[in-house]
């Protein structure tokens, strides 16, 4: 579960290493984001020659959470940490590579590009 002020690692090759959630999108009273939800983030740590700079604000989609995601068959998939992929204003991924596994819950029309770039889909 991601909320405002949560820090996430970045699972793409945009050059950002760590981001801070500044807003969970989807309603004025919405508090938590899970896998597949869109959040507004600011870059807290970035590589020197990356595509993004520290302090930049982007949309991002949550791809992994330590809280996990419950499936209809009763199984629970958890990860060691929280991770997100940076998106542009059209909600398309900025990076060209995805690092680490992503969950099958991202297989919607909006995020098929992320699923196809990911090395492993759980």
From Swiss-Prot:
GO terms for biological process: translation. It holds the Pfam family Ribosomal_L14. GO terms for cellular component: cytosolic large ribosomal subunit. InterPro entries: Ribosomal_uL14, Ribosomal_uL14_bac-type, Ribosomal_uL14_CS, Ribosomal_uL14_sf. PROSITE patterns: RIBOSOMAL_L14. GO terms for molecular function: large ribosomal subunit rRNA binding; structural constituent of ribosome. CDD domains: Ribosomal_uL14 (cd00337). Keywords: Ribonucleoprotein, Ribosomal protein, RNA-binding, rRNA-binding. The keyword Ribosomal protein applies. Part of the 50S ribosomal subunit. Forms a cluster with proteins L3 and L19. In the 70S ribosome, L14 and L19 interact and together make contacts with the 16S rRNA in bridges B5 and B8. Binds to 23S rRNA. Forms part of two intersubunit bridges in the 70S ribosome. Belongs to the universal ribosomal protein uL14 family. HAMAP family: Ribosomal_uL14. NCBIfam families: rplN_bact. This is Large ribosomal subunit protein uL14. It comes from Cupriavidus necator (strain ATCC 17699 / DSM 428 / KCTC 22496 / NCIMB 10442 / H16 / Stanier 337) (Ralstonia eutropha).
